[in-house]
Amino acid sequence: MPTTHFDLTLDICAEDGTRTRYYQQDEHIGGKTLRQLVSPRLFNQPLLTLASEHSVSAIPSRTIDVILAHTASPPPLTLPPQWLDVAEVNGESFLEAAGPDESPEARDQTASVVEIHTRGGWMVLLRVELAIQATFREERQFLAHFSDLPVIPFRLLAGGIGLINPPNIGRVTVTPPLKGVSETALQADLLSCSRP
C-alpha cells in the first residue's frame, strides 16, 4: 500500500522585501492551517500568528504583501463575486495558449493576465477569468475596486495557493486592456519599472 506524504511550506513575503518560510508536515495540522488561510478576512486581523511546538511567530498583517502556501493538496478558494478562476501563470503560457496568430483579445474575452507588483517588490502574474462583463462600467469596477478586496486568492502554478494583501499593491497591469478603462485613462505605454 503506497503512503502519501503531506507537506506544507508557507512563504510570507513582506513589504520590506523579506521572505520568511514556515513548514508543516502533519496532515491534520496542515489541513487546518490551509482552511484558516483561505478565510476572506485573513488580513483583517492585526497579527498573523504561526505556532509550533518550538516557537510562536507574530507578524503584523499590514506588513504582509503575499502568502504562498506550497502543497500538493490545496483547498478550494473563495473567490470574489464575478471571478471564476485565478491562477498563477508564466508570461509565455498565456500568450502561447491559442497560437501565435491570435491576438490576446480574440482568445478569451473573459480572461486577462494581471501583473501585480507589491510595495515589497514582489511580483505575481495571474490569469484571471471573470464572468462576462456586460458594460464598460462593470469593466471599470474590476480595476477600481481591486484594492478594496479583503484578499486576492489564487492557485499556484507549482501547486498550492497564494494570497495577496490588496492594500500593499503598488501597481496592477491588465492585459489585454479593459476597454472601459483604457478609453478614459491617460494614454501611455508602460516602458519600465525600477526600484531605487
Regions found by a protein language model. Give the residues of each.
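Short coil-to-beta-strand transition motifs
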Residues: 55-63, 160-168
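Detector for Asparagine
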Residues: 44, 90, 165-168
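Active-site micro-motifs of SAM-dependent methyltransferase domains
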Residues: 171
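Intrinsic disorder/low-complexity detector
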Residues: 1-20, 46, 53-55, 61-130, ...
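A cross-kingdom feature marking solvent-exposed beta-strand/loop segments within repeated
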Residues: 20-56, 132-141, 148, 153-161, ...
